[in-house]
């Protein structure tokens, strides 16, 4: 059984990927060990230390880089192999990875009864989120029949937020802190067809395809045109494809299996 070393002194230690690691451990997919808290000087940015990353094996083995940007890479770049969830550092010892919901355990329970039919979804195109980047502008409100952009992101409880998403046929994707946003994956797992906009990334180890899993719009006007022209039959096909991709790549079991698949295909021993 593989071991994953997880730091507990950083943000998001109980949600996103680091919360997902705990669920992997609970299910017996891997052993989870706390990363030792490093000794550092007063002016050190601890998030740049190797001990602030998740690792498979030991520190320095397989880095599981779950930060949004490339500003938290260990200075010595001393790893045997690396997986990149959001922004990606290209190189021989690296691979694109996957992405996941913010609260995987809660999401796993919620999705069971929340994958609605076309007619049971009241919102044609929607978005709900916070203004984490200047790229998230109100310009996009004009193409949505449900649009909430808050300063703090606390408009809904985690369950309330997922309930809102589940009532959308199409979900607008705007860049987050990095080029990917957890919301995009949360759309897919609920059968909401993503509408990708400039600045968003769709790069994953197992790729998603335009016209198969998502639509792509460069402007609000184009988004309106695309969702308006999409037949319910095509929407159903894309919605089903999104759910299938999510289960294989972003569910609790799917993320672990994809992680191991990447390592196997790159001949990386654990």
Question: Where in this protein do the model-derived segments appear?
Answer:
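Catalytic phosphate/metal-binding cores of nucleic-acid and nucleotide-processing enzymes, i.e., regions
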Residues: 162, 200, 220-223, 242
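Histidine- and aromatic-rich ligand-binding microenvironments
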Residues: 207-233
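Nucleotide-sugar donor-binding catalytic core of glycosyltransferases
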Residues: 1-212, 216, 248-267
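Conserved donor-nucleotide binding/catalytic region of nucleotide-linked donor-dependent transferases
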Residues: 225-248
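Alpha-helical elements of Rossmann-like donor-binding domains used by nucleotide-donor carbohydrate transfer enzymes
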Residues: 222-226, 241, 254-262
């Amino acid at each position: 059984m593989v071991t994953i070393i997880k730091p507990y002194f950083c943000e998001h230690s109980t949600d996103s990927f680091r919360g997902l690691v705990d669920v992997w451990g609970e299910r017996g997919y891997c052993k989870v060990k706390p990363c030792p808290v490093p000794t550092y000087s007063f002016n050190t940015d601890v998030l740049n230390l190797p001990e602030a990353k998740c690792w498979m094996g030991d520190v320095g083995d397989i880095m599981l880089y779950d930060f949004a940007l490339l500003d938290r890479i260990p200075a010595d770049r001393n790893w045997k192999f690396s997986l990149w969830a959001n922004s990606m550092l290209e190189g021989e010892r690296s691979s694109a990875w996957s992405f996941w919901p913010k609260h995987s355990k809660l999401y796993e329970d919620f999705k069971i009864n929340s994958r609605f039919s076309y007619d049971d979804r009241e919102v044609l195109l929607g978005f709900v989120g916070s203004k984490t980047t200047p790229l998230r502008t109100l310009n996009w409100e004009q193409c949505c029949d449900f649009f909430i952009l808050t300063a703090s992101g606390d408009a809904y409880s985690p369950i309330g937020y997922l309930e809102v998403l589940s009532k959308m046929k199409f979900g607008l994707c705007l860049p987050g802190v990095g080029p990917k946003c957890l919301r995009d994956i949360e759309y897919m797992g609920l059968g909401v067809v993503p509408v990708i906009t400039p600045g968003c990334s769709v790069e994953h180890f197992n790729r998603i395809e335009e016209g198969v899993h998502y639509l792509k719009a460069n402007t609000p006007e184009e988004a309106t045109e695309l969702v308006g022209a999409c037949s319910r039959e095509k929407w159903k096909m894309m919605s089903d494809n999104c759910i299938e991709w999510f289960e294989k790549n972003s569910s609790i079991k799917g993320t672990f299996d994809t992680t191991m698949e990447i390592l196997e295909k790159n001949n990386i021993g654990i």
